[in-house]
A protein has these predicted regions:
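Conserved positions within compact, well-structured domain cores
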Residues: 1-109
């Protein structure tokens, strides 16, 4: 998906990430609370974590980030789509490094 696709989804869900999240989401830090995951949309966003520079297992269960296509739909965008356990906001972040591994989501139009 490109950012237009993600923005359509965000608008449809009224930016409530709980509707995308499934599985067990862990608190970011000890003593914190993880927001609920309802998956009412059927999206099945499982918190598989991500690889940033080196594998960081502390991201597992807490984050889910997807590569996003640029406006030409031919290259990876500088910004990624991500969900995290401590909020039910749908967020974006700069990709930031060449050594990054994120999830891939395909859509059928």
């Amino acid at each position: 998906p490109n950012w237009e696709d993600w923005n359509i989804l965000k608008t449809y869900l009224k930016e409530d990430a709980s509707l995308l999240k499934s599985g067990t989401w862990l608190p970011l830090n000890t003593g914190d609370t993880a927001e609920p995951a309802t998956n009412w949309s059927g999206f099945d966003g499982i918190p598989v974590g991500m690889y940033v520079g080196t594998f960081q297992s502390n991201y597992e269960g807490k984050y889910l980030a997807y590569w996003t296509l640029d406006e030409t739909n031919s290259e990876i965008a500088e910004t990624v789509f991500y969900l995290k356990s401590d909020t039910n906001l749908i967020e974006s972040s700069k990709a930031g490094t060449d050594k990054k591994a994120l999830a891939i989501r395909c859509i059928r139009k």
